[in-house]
Structures are given as structure tokens and as C-alpha cells.
Swiss-Prot record:
Keyword rRNA-binding (UniProt): no
SMART domains, per the entry: KU
Coiled-coil parts of chain: none
Classification of source organism: Eukaryota, Metazoa, Chordata, Craniata, Vertebrata
Record-linked SUPFAM superfamilies: BPTI-like (SSF57362), Elafin-like (SSF57256)
Domain WAP as annotated: residue spans: 37-84
BPTI/Kunitz inhibitor domain location: 88-138
GO cellular component, one term: extracellular region
PROSITE patterns with a match to the protein in the record: BPTI_KUNITZ_1, BPTI_KUNITZ_2, WAP
Origin superkingdom: Eukaryota
Record-linked InterPro entries: Elafin-like_sf, Kunitz_BPTI, Kunitz_BPTI_sf, Prtase_inh_Kunz-CS, Serpin_venom_toxin, WAP_dom
Protein's UniProt name: WAP four-disulfide core domain protein 6B
Length: 148
């Protein structure tokens, strides 16, 4: 009698094929952002924020963002964010355009949300439609994280 051992079928590696093929195909894509579901970097999650109006989306998918930035639902619209930087520590940036849009930014030195005039284009994500949204994202988040 043969010794008691687990006899694996001859086709043991073929069972992995359905899992390996999609992985190989996604790995070979020239633009890695096209395989969005594979990557671990995730967008920040915020509690429901009450917005007076929905902002124009800067992006719809990660591949529409430059470099390593990710397309995230942030404040009141979708924006390209660099997940390695703290948005609330960015300086005030009105951008090069000449619109007159009252906005709010978080000043890390004073720990306050301060009103400024946004030009309507470019700038950075430390730019909120209201003081309430700025407070919700930058001040309340910091209070919660200081407890951890």
C-alpha cells in the first residue's frame, strides 16, 4: 500500500490560472493608474460634509490626475490630491486667474480657517467653499487625531 499522503492532481497549478491572468494583464498595463483597483493608496475619508453647492469636478478617475496624484472626493467635489502631503498644511494660493471667489483656507500657524479671495483656477486643495467645510476637514480632523 502506498503511504498515506495527500495526492495533488497533476493540474494543481492550473487552478491558479483564473487569478493569475487578470493580475498579469493589469501588471503589464503601460499606465499603472489604469489598474486603479490594484493599488493600496486610498483617498481620505471624511464624514458627510454639508456643501452649499457642489463644486465642479477636477477629475473623475485617477488617470486624469498628473503624476502620483489620485482623484478623490474631497470637500465638495472630486479633486486631484497628492496623498503624501497634508492638505491642511499647504499655504494659501489664490491661483493665477482673476475671478473673485470668497473661499476659506486653513492656516496651520494660527490653527484657524481664514477667508481669502480665490481666482478661480489652479491654486491648491487647501481651498474650501465655506468656513464650516474648512473646519470640518482641518480643525475637527486634527482634534480627533490628537486623541489617538
Amino acid at each position: 500500500m502506498p503511504p498515506n499522503r495527500l495526492l495533488l492532481p497533476k493540474m494543481r497549478l492550473w487552478g491558479l490560472l483564473p487569478f493569475l491572468v487578470p493580475f498579469i494583464l493589469l501588471w503589464s498595463i503601460q499606465e499603472p493608474a489604469l489598474a486603479e483597483g490594484v493599488f493600496i493608496r486610498t483617498c481620505p475619508k471624511y464624514n458627510k460634509i454639508k456643501c452649499d453647492f457642489e463644486e465642479r469636478n477636477q477629475c473623475l478617475r485617477h488617470r486624469e490626475c498628473p503624476g502620483e496624484e489620485r482623484c478623490c472626493l474631497f470637500a465638495c467635489g472630486r479633486k486631484c490630491l497628492d496623498l503624501s502631503e497634508d492638505i491642511c498644511s499647504l499655504p494659501q494660493d489664490a491661483g493665477p486667474c482673476l475671478a473673485y471667489l470668497p473661499r476659506w483656507w486653513y492656516n496651520q500657524d494660527t490653527k484657524l480657517c481664514i477667508e481669502f479671495i480665490y481666482g478661480g483656477c489652479q491654486g491648491n486643495p487647501n481651498n474650501f467653499e465655506s468656513k464650516a467645510v474648512c473646519t470640518s476637514i482641518c480643525i475637527n480632523k486634527r482634534k480627533m487625531s490628537s486623541w489617538i
